[in-house]
Every structure is written in C-alpha cells, then in structure tokens.
Regions:
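Carbohydrate-active enzymes and regulators
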Residues: 1-194
Length: 194
C-alpha cells in the first residue's frame, strides 16, 4: 500500500438494537403490567441512554441502529408512565434501603445470598443504583425519551429504525393488517421527535 492510500477495513460490523414491549400503561402492575415497563426502563433504557449520551459527548458517530416500536416510544413519552416511573424508582430506593438496614436473622445458612449481611450488601448496591437512576431520570427523562433520542440522532450517534406499529407475528396476520401495521409504524417513525 502506498502512503496516500486509505487503510482498508478488514470487515464491517453492524450493531442493531431492537426494543419492544406491549402497551402496559393502565393494565395493572404485576406480573405483566406496568411493573414490566418500569423494570425494563430502569434496567435497559436508562443505562443504554447513559452509554449513548457518553458516546455522543465523545463525538462518536454511527454507533448503532436502534429499533424502537411506536408503542415503546409512546410509553417512554407518556406523562402517566413518566410519573409512574418516577414513583417506581423512588419505591426501588425505599426497598433497597430496607434491605440495606436489615438486621433480623433470616434463618439462612452462613455464606448464602439470603443472610442479613448479604442482603445488606445487596441493599447498599441497589440503593446507590436507584439513587443514580432517580437523579438521572429527574434531570434527563422528565419530558420523555423523544428529546434524548433526538439529541442522539442529531449527533449522528444513533440511527433510529422504524418498524410495525405494534409487534405482532407478521406471518400470521391477515395481509391487510400486516400492511396497515407496517405502513402506520413507518409513518410514526417518520414523525419528528421532540
């Protein structure tokens, strides 16, 4: 190779993250209700956005393609869900505080995960993580996911991928319903984010 020739890339790698949950707001708490949304939000969406915002701040571009169904995006922007998530995070921190201050013997064998000391250590870690999530949510997420996604898209860090309106198993749908789900989902993805 000459000194002027660009270095060849030995291969390419594409990272595509796809996310989907059904509409969970106002459908109860547990086991398949809002608790599922809030757990996913705290364990997946908050850390993912944290990492992507860090990469965007470093000037990283073309990091990944993110598939967000309209149902998920709508819930992450919905005022009812935003309030519910804030309450869920506060309750997470309270549950962690209870575990962190546990002094009652549990009857567990020494050295197991359910001893008071193990539960205290778990509670301390969870309390710290819940506090971080609460602070981050309060400062970054109070207006939903769309402003955060818009920031990442504008920075060129993330490419947003459209898809079906919901997430049915496409081959089993009536062709008219399949066409509707894809057409409306892509139209939704074409709408400008905050």
């Amino acid at each position: 190779m000459s000194a002027d020739a660009p270095e060849q890339v030995p291969g390419q790698f594409t990272l595509v993250l796809h996310t989907h949950l059904p509409w969970l707001a106002h459908h109860g708490r547990w086991p398949v209700g809002e608790e599922w949304l809030y757990q996913s939000w705290s364990a997946a969406y908050l850390p993912l956005m944290r990492v992507l915002r860090t990469l965007a701040a470093e000037g990283r571009r073309g990091v990944l393609t993110l598939g967000m169904t309209p149902v998920v995006t709508a819930q992450l922007d919905d005022p009812y869900c935003l309030d519910g998530m804030h309450r869920w995070l506060a309750n997470w921190q309270l549950r962690a505080l209870e575990a962190a201050t546990l002094h009652t013997p549990t009857g567990a064998e020494p050295g197991t995960a359910s001893t008071p000391e193990a539960l205290r250590q778990f509670g301390i870690r969870e309390y710290d993580e819940a506090g971080r999530a609460l602070e981050e949510f309060g400062t970054l997420w109070r207006h939903g996911a769309s402003p955060l996604l818009r920031e990442l898209i504008d920075a060129g860090t993330v490419e947003l991928l459209g898809g079906p309106l919901a997430h049915p198993f496409q081959p089993l749908l009536n062709p008219r319903l399949r066409e509707f789900a894809l057409r409306e989902g892509l139209a939704d993805a074409g709408q400008p984010l905050a």
